[in-house]
């Protein structure tokens, strides 16, 4: 489910797909001596020097770099006013408006060079200049366009990006000249690092400011269920007077980006709601996976339908556990639920903890991940060596499967609860739609 771009290779690869190498970049070579010591200080000299050499070569040539390559070179050469003009030309050439999805990946660089230009023109700090650039750019964007563009402002792992730049420099060692295509690649990597390390300390606050202008955000709604439990929800509403339908996800996963997920729904004209399994996040109750999600989703849907901002219609969507909870809600047939859009839904009792009388250990650690606290136990769950070898340890122990947690050394009470129901019995059937429930289904799926 991890949807935010955190891997440096992904960031660079996606940005590169927007750009096209031209004949100039393919045909020419440029002098470059890779520094003997590859560190930030040496690259801060070598890469801008390389960028200026490429620009000088272009001035001497009858050919021109494609604008999609040129602005990377100009950023690396610290020619930010030129880079801003080139980016605007690139947008115009391709028909990419400020709000277009195809041009969204360039927004961080565009804001960076615009801010650097303001620094030079107005003699202000970069922080003040970037705030002005950000506000000027986003003020005129509609909610969907702003959401798309802000998705590119999350800081990627800069240390990994620096290591990848260093590796790219090492690959061209031992030669006095490199192709312009290689030069563009080095400058592109360098420009991304320069951009993100400058803007990363500023973007969270600015994104929060913009969101507050667009939406009413309740990051900690608490809803009582009929049996006295409390479930927690994130609610994001567009700042409009009209009553709106609600797009709901119900999940056990307390990922940091669930707020962004609710904002995405609000950006598309819905009230965005993410509800959480009882016991998760700020719910004071014990964590209960699967068993109460249908009842609790129904309670949340009914609560939503009574709110003054709701038009009485709720649709659910999502995958994996979030897909299961839709079928769990359908079993209880809340009147306000008008559609579900599940994909790749989890189905407890099939595959967890066994399939066709064969016990599976693939999800053995999952109960710890989701029930060890209000959030997610990433540390324990990511102990890959422990979980990947547990199956063999149990097999070699000769002990019955019900004692696998004793082999591991950490009690797994949810597993013990589940293996008491090896068949798809009433325990599992009570959790989600099955059998005659499908015949009663009267909403689009």
Pin down the residues of each PLM region.
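Glycine-rich nucleophile elbow surrounding the catalytic serine of serine-hydrolase chemistry
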Residues: 318-328
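Accessory cap/linker subdomain of secreted extracellular hydrolases
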Residues: 145-197, 206-209, 331-440
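N-terminal cap/lid segment of alpha/beta-hydrolase-fold proteins
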Residues: 201-242
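Cap/lid segment of the alpha/beta-hydrolase catalytic domain
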Residues: 238-305
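Bacterial N-terminal signal peptides
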Residues: 9-22
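Alpha/beta-hydrolase fold nucleophile elbow
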Residues: 308-320
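N-terminal targeting or regulatory segments adjacent to alpha/beta-hydrolase or S9 domains
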Residues: 25-215
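Catalytic His-Asp charge-relay segment
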Residues: 442-445
């Amino acid at each position: 489910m991890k949807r935010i771009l955190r891997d440096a290779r992904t960031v660079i690869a996606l940005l590169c797909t927007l750009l096209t190498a031209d004949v100039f970049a393919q045909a020419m070579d440029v002098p470059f001596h890779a520094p003997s010591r590859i560190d930030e200080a040496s690259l801060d000299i070598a890469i801008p020097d390389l960028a200026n050499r490429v620009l000088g070569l272009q001035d001497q040539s009858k050919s021109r770099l494609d604008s999609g390559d040129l602005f990377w070179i100009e950023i690396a050469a610290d020619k930010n006013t030129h880079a801003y003009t080139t980016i605007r030309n690139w947008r115009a050439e391709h028909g990419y408006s400020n709000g277009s999805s195809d041009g969204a990946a360039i927004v961080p660089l565009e804001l960076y060079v615009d801010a650097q230009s303001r620094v030079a023109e107005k003699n202000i700090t970069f922080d003040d200049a970037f705030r002005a650039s950000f506000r000027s750019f986003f003020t005129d964007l509609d909610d969907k366009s702003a959401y798309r563009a802000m998705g590119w402002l999350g800081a990627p792992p800069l240390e990994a990006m620096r290591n990848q730049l260093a590796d790219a420099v090492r690959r061209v060692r031992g030669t006095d000249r490199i192709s312009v295509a290689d030069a563009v690649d080095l400058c592109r990597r360098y420009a991304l690092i320069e951009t993100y390390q400058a803007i990363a300390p500023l973007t969270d606050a600015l994104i929060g400011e913009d969101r507050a202008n667009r939406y009413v955000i309740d990051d900690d709604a608490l809803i009582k269920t009929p049996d006295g439990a409390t479930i927690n929800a994130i609610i994001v509403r567009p700042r409009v007077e009209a009553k709106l339908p609600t797009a709901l996800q119900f999940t056990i996963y307390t990922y940091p980006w669930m707020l962004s997920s609710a904002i995405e729904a609000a950006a598309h004209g819905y009230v965005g709601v993410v509800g959480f399994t009882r016991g998760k996040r700020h719910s004071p109750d014990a964590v209960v996976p699967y068993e109460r999600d249908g009842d609790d989703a129904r309670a949340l849907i009914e609560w939503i339908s009574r709110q003054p901002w709701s038009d009485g219609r709720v649709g659910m969507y999502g995958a994996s556990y979030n897909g299961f909870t839709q079928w769990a809600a359908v079993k209880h047939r809340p009147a306000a639920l008008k559609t579900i859009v599940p994909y790749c839904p989890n189905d407890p009792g099939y595959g967890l903890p066994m399939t066709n009388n064969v016990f599976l250990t693939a999800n053995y650690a999952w109960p710890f991940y989701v029930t060890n606290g209000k959030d997610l136990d990433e540390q324990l769950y990511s102990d890959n060596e422990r979980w990947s070898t547990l199956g063999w340890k149990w097999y070699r122990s000769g002990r019955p499967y019900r004692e696998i947690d004793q082999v591991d050394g950490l009690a797994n009470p949810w597993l013990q609860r589940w293996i008491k129901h090896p068949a798809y019995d009433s325990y599992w059937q009570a959790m989600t739609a099955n059998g005659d429930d499908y015949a009663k289904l009267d909403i689009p799926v």
